[in-house]
A protein has these predicted regions:
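Short, charge-rich amphipathic alpha-helices with coiled-coil/heptad character
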Residues: 1-13
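Short, charge/polar-rich alpha-helical segments
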Residues: 12-26
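Heptad-repeat coiled-coil/leucine-zipper interface motif in alpha-helices
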Residues: 24-27, 62, 73
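Short E/K-rich amphipathic alpha-helical oligomerization segments
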Residues: 29-57
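Extended heptad-repeat coiled-coil alpha-helical scaffolds of eukaryotic proteins
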Residues: 29-33, 67-71, 75
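Long amphipathic alpha-helical coiled-coil segments
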Residues: 44-47, 72-88
Length: 88
């Protein structure tokens, strides 16, 4: 092991965060698809139950907002990384 610590540039750090957010977005999308299938089962399918359909609808809306917010954060970070790279 080395005693020297590697310090990342801000652009490198932001690039790492962007990669992590993209991975999180992938899993969030998968979760949204799972919630959607459960919602359909409660809303129109074989387990028709209005109360659960409403609960899953609320969860889907929140998950959709999370996906939108993650997408926006990714875009903002990518713009910042590009600007930092152009400055150097």
């Amino acid at each position: 092991m080395s005693d020297t610590e590697v310090v990342k540039t801000k652009a490198d750090y932001l690039r790492d965060v962007t990669t992590q957010l993209k991975e999180m977005r992938h899993y969030a999308q998968t979760n949204t698809e799972t919630l959607s299938s459960h919602w359909l089962a409660f809303d129109e399918g074989e387990y028709k139950d209005g109360e659960y359909a409403a609960k899953f609808d609320t969860l889907l809306n929140k998950q959709g907002k999370l996906l939108d917010d993650i997408d926006q954060a990714i875009q903002d970070l990518e713009i910042t990384v590009n600007n930092l790279e152009q400055e150097n």
